[in-house]
């Protein structure tokens, strides 16, 4: 596993304040000390101009610009310094069409809500792996026994 580091900067993009709070708490519990927040993709694009995140965790369905468009914009220009930043989508929209759209846009990992700390840690580890291009995965952590604390969809969407 890739060690999780306090030195890494994580940008969380979600229009739900409750979800941003939960993600912040989980990331801090995992050892991340530098967490930036954006309440939509437009704000995230502004944050990225000032802070180069090592990892982006974004929601899929947001007002103004959805997560897929946000990722496509980041990945569009390969010469852009942020085109290779690892990206995880965390969403309650787990239908195959959403997973496929995310992966085609360039998302590194897909995390279905409700999230667990363990599932998030696994996705982060894979997203930050040096050979992440070869291990891009889309997994569904839906109807099975949770491996840690879970958060109900009502708190997240």
What residue ranges belong to the model's regions?
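Short amphipathic alpha-helix used as the core "switch/output" element in two-component signaling
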Residues: 46, 68-82
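Receiver (REC) domain active-site loop signature in two-component systems and cognate sites
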Residues: 62
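CheY-like receiver
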Residues: 126-157
């Amino acid at each position: 596993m890739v060690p999780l580091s306090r030195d890494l900067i994580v940008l969380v993009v979600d229009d739900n304040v409750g979800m941003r709070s939960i993600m912040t708490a989980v990331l801090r519990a995992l050892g991340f000390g530098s967490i930036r927040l954006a309440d939509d993709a437009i704000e995230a694009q502004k944050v990225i101009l000032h802070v180069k995140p090592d990892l982006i965790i974004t929601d899929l369905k947001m007002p103004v610009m959805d997560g897929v468009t946000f990722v496509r914009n980041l990945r569009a220009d390969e010469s852009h310094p942020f085109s290779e930043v690892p990206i995880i989508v965390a969403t309650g929209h787990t239908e195959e069409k959403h997973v496929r759209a995310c992966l085609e846009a360039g998302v590194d990992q897909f995390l279905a809500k409700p999230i667990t700390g363990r599932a998030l840690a696994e996705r982060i580890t894979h997203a930050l792996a040096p050979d992440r291009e070869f291990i891009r995965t889309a997994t569904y952590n839906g109807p099975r026994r949770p491996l840690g604390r879970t958060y109900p969809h009502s708190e997240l969407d």
